[in-house]
Swiss-Prot record:
One of its GO terms (molecular function) is nucleic acid binding. Pfam families: UPF0102. Belongs to the UPF0102 family. This is UPF0102 protein PA4424.
Amino acid sequence: MTDRESSRDKGRQAEELACAHLRRQGLATLGKNWTCRRGELDLVMLDGDTVVFVEVRSRRHRAWGGALESIDARKRQRLILSAELFLQQEARWAKRPCRFDVVTVDTSDGQSPPRLDWIQNAFDA
C-alpha cells in the first residue's frame, strides 16, 4: 500500500466515523463523497429541514496545524461551488436552508477512539 492509498484509507475512515457520529446526533445521510468538476463533498446530511454540507478533516500531527485551520479560503470556495452544483442536480433539496459544518477527527495523541469535534456553521457561503 502506498502512502497515498494509506492517507486515502485514513480519510475514508475519518469520514465513516464522522458520519456515524452525526447520525447518532439525529442527522440523516443524503450522500457521501459526492464528486463534481469543482471538487468533492465528504458528506451531505439532513438536519431537520436543513441540508448540511460536511467537510471532514483528520489530523495525526498537531505540528502541521489543526484540522479546522487546514480549510483555507480556496477550499471553502470549492466547497461552496460543489454545494451549489449538488443543489442544482438534486433539486428536491434546493429550496431548503443550508449550512456548512466541519467535523474534525483528531488522532494526534493516539487516543482510541479518536476525538471528534462537530463545528456547526463553520463558515458562511
